[in-house]
Design a protein with these regions (language model features):
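GH16 jelly-roll
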Residues: 1-160
């Protein structure tokens, strides 16, 4: 319902975010430092976010594909890296059970409806804390000043 209510009232689920300023401050952990996040609220100036960061036991920047999974039911939204494998790790969970339309801070008010999927590769701005294009380390001579994201496939399953 983005066209009808706008952001953040439409709700936003960031399944995987990497490149956070916190990861850059711990260079030996940067390749495994990530988070999921949910954003909601009635307006820009009353925007709420829950997106704790974590460090995985394995790197997602090892040149291999990784299975990133979201499970979303009536109670929780959960995000996993390497789902269904020996190295599976849950890195995000938010409780969306409660619904109370008299309280616009309640996350459950915004996550009980269909969503659409966007893939976004950002290399500067608020999240990494980089404002000067010359300081963006993701763009360099080694990669011909190009940032790339490779997605092998996307599957969506839904209960009837």
């Amino acid at each position: 319902d983005f066209d009808q209510v706008g952001w953040p009232a439409c709700g936003e689920l960031d399944i995987l975010e990497m490149g956070n300023a916190g990861g850059f401050s711990s260079p030996n952990k940067a390749a495994a430092y990530l988070n999921g996040a949910c954003h909601w609220g009635p307006s820009w100036d009353k925007h709420y976010c829950y997106g704790p960061s974590t460090t995985l036991n394995t790197s997602l920047q090892d040149g291999e594909f990784h299975l990133i999974t979201v499970t979303w039911d009536e109670q929780y939204i959960r995000c996993y890296a390497n789902y269904g494998t020996a190295t599976q790790e849950k890195y995000y969970e938010i409780d969306v059970t409660k619904v109370d339309f008299s309280d616009n801070t309640v996350a459950g008010n915004y996550f009980k409806k269909p969503f659409f999927i966007i893939f976004n590769l950002a290399v500067g701005g608020n999240f990494p804390g980089i404002w000067d294009i010359n300081q963006i380390s993701a763009l360099n001579a080694d990669n011909n000043y190009e940032a790339k994201m490779y997605i092998d496939y996307v599957k969506v399953y839904q209960k009837k």
